[in-house]
């Protein structure tokens, strides 16, 4: 998508982002997402906007994700815009339904919904 001309913006929503790093050191979905976006930006520079939305009902989890990303990807503002949210997935999805139905055809929205944790 980063090289497709008909797409101007990509929004990626992780509605159960968790802590970002598992107790065994494995990386969770928000960290893997940032890694993937950085890799794509490094190999295929583009002016397309990539927006990441990381949400969890546990505020401490969201803070841990934010801290990890800021420490390990201090240049993240150069390759994406990250919004951190704290709330229930159900409420977030309700809020987004009306808004996303009005987005431009050049904007693509992806949702990662996994309440039980990402496993590779």
Task: Give, region by region, the residue ranges found by the protein language model.
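SAM cofactor-binding core of SAM-dependent methyltransferases
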Residues: 1-95
